[in-house]
Regions:
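An N-terminal structural lobe/cap that precedes and organizes the functional/catalytic core
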Residues: 1-99, 195-224
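Short, hydrophobic/amphipathic alpha-helical patches that form generic packing surfaces
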Residues: 6, 22-30, 103-115, 175, ...
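Amphipathic alpha-helical interaction surfaces
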Residues: 66-70, 115-118, 183
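Active-site-proximal alpha-helical scaffolds that flank and shape metal-associated catalytic sites
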Residues: 82-155
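An amphipathic alpha-helical core segment
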Residues: 125-213
């Protein structure tokens, strides 16, 4: 799941460290895709400070949410249906429809949460801005990452630009997909492909809107 979908499960929690921990695995990977850390396997390292423990608590919830989501019939069905619906839109693109179907589904879920006013993005940004950088730095250092400047460079941009607001606009999802794909391919889509991809996703959002909440309810039951 993407940032806002993860936040959905902590939307009623007021602990900034738990909320940040819930999205931290993706932030770490976005800052440097070579970083592959597993704090959940070294719990004893994170027991001396309550805020550090809260970051770890959120981290573990993130992993559990993704595990439930990616093994659900909802995910398997809709990522396949999106793949089928967009494959003609991206003919000739180096991007595989399967890859795009997976990411598109996650971004559409974020979009629907915003469209239905089920989360408050401003509260999300407010909470993560309350996290003490020194505590976050210590958590990252405990995971054997020394180059925290690299992380905080990305994290500061993430907080400043607040690009998650853009997910409320379905047309901006294609832009987000392009940015993600550009990490792997220099020119993932032509302008014409982007146009047709956007139309396909807008159409699929209509199909998804009537049932997307079921997956959040399912995960919530298993998580809590």
């Amino acid at each position: 799941m993407n940032f806002l979908s993860h936040y959905y499960f902590d939307r009623n929690r007021g602990n900034p460290y738990e909320v940040l921990g819930m999205v931290l695995p993706d932030l770490i990977k976005n800052a440097d895709k070579s970083w592959n850390i597993h704090p959940e396997k070294n719990i004893h390292l994170f027991s001396e400070d309550e805020n550090i423990k809260s970051l770890l608590f959120g981290w573990k919830r993130h992993l559990e949410v993704d595990k439930i989501f990616h093994n659900s019939s909802f995910f398997l069905y809709h990522q396949h249906q999106i793949k089928v619906s967009i494959k003609d839109s991206i003919l000739g693109s180096p991007v595989k429809p399967f890859f795009l179907g997976h990411i598109s589904l996650e971004l559409l879920l974020d979009n629907l949460l915003l469209s239905e006013n089920l989360i408050d993005v401003e509260v999300f940004y407010k909470l993560i801005n309350e996290v003490d950088d020194q505590i976050l730095k210590k958590f990252i250092n405990l995971n054997q990452i020394e180059d925290t400047d690299r992380f905080f460079y990305f994290f500061d941009i993430f907080k400043k630009e607040k690009y998650l607001y853009n997910y409320s606009n379905t047309e901006k999802i294609t832009y987000a997909l392009r940015r993600i794909c550009m990490r792997l391919w220099q020119n993932p889509f032509t302008e014409e492909q982007e146009y047709h991809l956007t139309k396909s996703l807008i159409l699929y959002k209509t199909k998804l809107s009537g049932e997307f909440l079921h997956i959040f309810e399912l995960i919530d039951l298993q998580l809590n």
